């Protein structure tokens, strides 16, 4: 049995195949996922698992260099936005690097998901609970 934190074989495999600057999306239950992008559906029911639960597990395994977030989260989901920023700050300290945070419109965000290696769908049902993670290197 795998000893690492990620037990889901699809997520573990996807993270292990990421190269520098490749992207991976963690999203809420409502984000449209392009047919051309690999979909890893973790949603069981509304809120399970939460966006932050999925993000926490993914970022424990993935080296993150940058993050892209929809600008609209600031107004429409400020509590999650603050939680997300705190998580990224803690991740920076743990990884020993600076994580660049970029904001874009939700429409542009949806277009960028088509370029990602995969989209991991959580059961989150709050607005704009989505992030594009850009892979870094550990050396």
UniProtKB/Swiss-Prot annotation:
Protein function: Catalyzes the interconversion of beta-pyran and beta-furan forms of D-ribose.
Pfam families for this protein: RbsD_FucU
Active site: 20 (proton donor)
Family: Belongs to the RbsD / FucU family. RbsD subfamily.
Protein origin, superkingdom: Bacteria
Main subcellular localisation: cytoplasm
Any one GO cellular component localisation term in the record: cytosol
Keyword Isomerase listed: yes
The EC number(s) this enzyme carries: 5.4.99.62
Protein's name according to its UniProt entry: D-ribose pyranase
Pathway(s) of this molecule: Carbohydrate metabolism; D-ribose degradation; D-ribose 5-phosphate from beta-D-ribopyranose: step 1/2
UniProt catalytic activity: beta-D-ribopyranose = beta-D-ribofuranose
Gene3D superfamilies: RbsD-like domain (3.40.1650.10)
GO process terms (BP): D-ribose catabolic process
Residues the record lists as binding substrate: 28, 106, 128-130
Name of the coding gene: rbsD
Subunit composition and interactions: Homodecamer.
């Amino acid at each position: 049995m795998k000893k690492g934190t990620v037990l889901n074989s699809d997520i573990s495999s996807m993270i292990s195949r990421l190269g520098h600057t490749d992207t991976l999306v963690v999203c809420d239950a409502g984000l449209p996922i392009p047919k051309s992008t690999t979909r890893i559906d973790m949603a069981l029911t509304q809120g399970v698992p939460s966006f932050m639960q999925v993000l926490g597990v993914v970022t424990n395994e993935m080296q993150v260099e940058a993050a892209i977030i929809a600008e609209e989260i600031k107004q429409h989901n400020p509590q999650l936005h603050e939680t997300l920023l705190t998580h990224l700050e803690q991740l920076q300290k743990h990884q020993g690097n600076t994580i660049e945070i970029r904001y874009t419109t939700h429409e542009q965000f949806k277009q960028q998901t088509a370029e990602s290696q995969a989209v991991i769908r959580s059961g989150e049902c709050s607005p704009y609970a989505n992030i594009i993670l850009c892979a870094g290197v550990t050396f």
